[in-house]
Amino acid sequence: MLMVVAMTDITQFQNTNKGEHDFCSGLYLVPTPIGNLRDITLRALDVLKACDVVVCEDTRVTGKLLKAYNITDKKKIVYNDHAQEKDKNRILTYLNEGKIIALVSDAGTPLISDPGYKLVVEVIKQGIYLTALPGANAILPALQLSGLPSDQFTFGGFLPSKDKALRDSVESLKNRSETFVFYDSPRRVAKSCAVITEILEGRSIKIIREISKLYEEMIEYDPAIDMSSLKGEIVVVIEGQSKNINMSLNDIEPMIINALNKGESLKDLSNMIADKTGLKKKDIYNHAITLKD
């Protein structure tokens, strides 16, 4: 459990409500199912039953979930991409009054490509109790189903919808060896994959859709496949660059310069780039010295 109030006795947050499960006042980040209603944890249900207020993106969507588990007496507040400062302040007022607040998204884990982070930042600043419950998300199941390396991966949110932004985003992956996970929409995924194939020639691309639902499917992308009929939630998983690809020191100069600009030491950046590219640490180190000078 993430405790963000350093060196503070948790009892100061205790809510006076008593029941089968006692929870202290504060903000609880509660994951919700991404497709199958049964993919909710017992602890998440405990929090939803015990909380005073449920903060959600859409009261209709959250209302259906609560009703499915016979939780019908909860006050619901909308907090989404269109939320204003007054909406955030209203929630903070409840928290400072000692209320138990559950923050949920329409589907999956709150704050993952989802509104809510501004509220969390303020909660941390004010020293209000905060905890995040583990639970459903689309990222890890997609990575598991892809069959691509999962020891190192990067989640990049939604792939850009505009052409230049998409190309720039994909170009930035060229010299990186970890697996990449992105969200995309059914109407854009064919174009996105075509651009990825053009720029990252030879990389494996997996499309995973409808995770945990009846028509869950993993597709190995091929330009010949007709994807016009794809529906549902889409996750795109992209293979990283093979470390066996021959790269020159000139190829990694942007990586070195970027690391130097971030203030990384020559030793650290040499280790990091060697791990990603397979080049010798000593060669990278010496080349970085020349660039630094």
Residue ranges and their predicted role:
Residues 48-54, 127-131, 179-180:
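Short active-site oxyanion
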Residues 118-176:
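Class I SAM-dependent methyltransferase SAM-binding "motif I" and its flanking Rossmann-like core
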Residues 60-62, 108, 138, 188:
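Alpha-helix capping/helix-boundary segments
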Residues 56, 132-135, 182, 207:
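General beta-strand structural signal in soluble alpha/beta enzymes
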Residues 12-13, 24, 100, 179, ...:
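A contiguous loop/helix-start segment that scaffolds small-molecule binding in enzyme catalytic cores
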Residues 79-85, 159-160:
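Conserved helicase motor
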Residues 6-80:
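Glycine-rich, flexible N-terminal cofactor/catalytic loop recognition
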Residues 88-137, 141:
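Glycine/small-residue-rich loop that forms an oxyanion/phosphate-binding "nest" at active or ligand-binding sites
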